[in-house]
Amino acid sequence: MSFKTNAVPDEVIELLINVRPVIEKIGGVYLAGGTALSLFLGHRVSIDLDFFTPNDFLATPLSQDLNQLGPYVPIDVKNNSLVCKVKEVQFSLFKYGYPLICPLEYYSNISIASLRDIAAMKIGAIGDRGARKDFYDLYAILNYTSIKIEDILKDVCAKFSIPEDSLYHYIKALIFFQESRKEPDIKPLIKMNVQWEDIESFFCKLAPTLIQ
């Protein structure tokens, strides 16, 4: 796998590499979210590290280890869920019980969720809240990889153990922009030649084709 680091700031890459000994103590930890996707596609600037693990973990020893890596600011610290900043880079680790669809990839010996898994998680995120970054990310997956929306929806069913007749909620969420329109546009962070209006138009055309 060839990774793209042009859209991930140096300080994020530095923390990603330096944090490996810390997260290895917990086991089963992998990177997902926007930075993982940016390493695959280079489609937008991403400045945080979102890690997941199927394992339980204690927040206090993890916080102590992270504090050794540089200036540490706790944001939300509790067992099985930790959000903080390390050297001004946001770091999060959550216990996440949903299974991986595909084998992990590896960047500098850091486990990274596959594109298929990230795509399913993005659909899940859009179904929950629909942030602009999630729409941009899913657009990038559908336009810059060979992954089809139909395959992603099948993965959603497998990953989250939901029946196919429950997919209507996620399909409908693809054209629910009320919350995302309230957010500041992140176009300055986008490396693709696309405007937010193009994103909305794309999904408004796509969603009706998925309803049988």
Which positions does each model-derived feature cover?
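Compositionally biased terminal segments of proteins
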Residues: 1-212
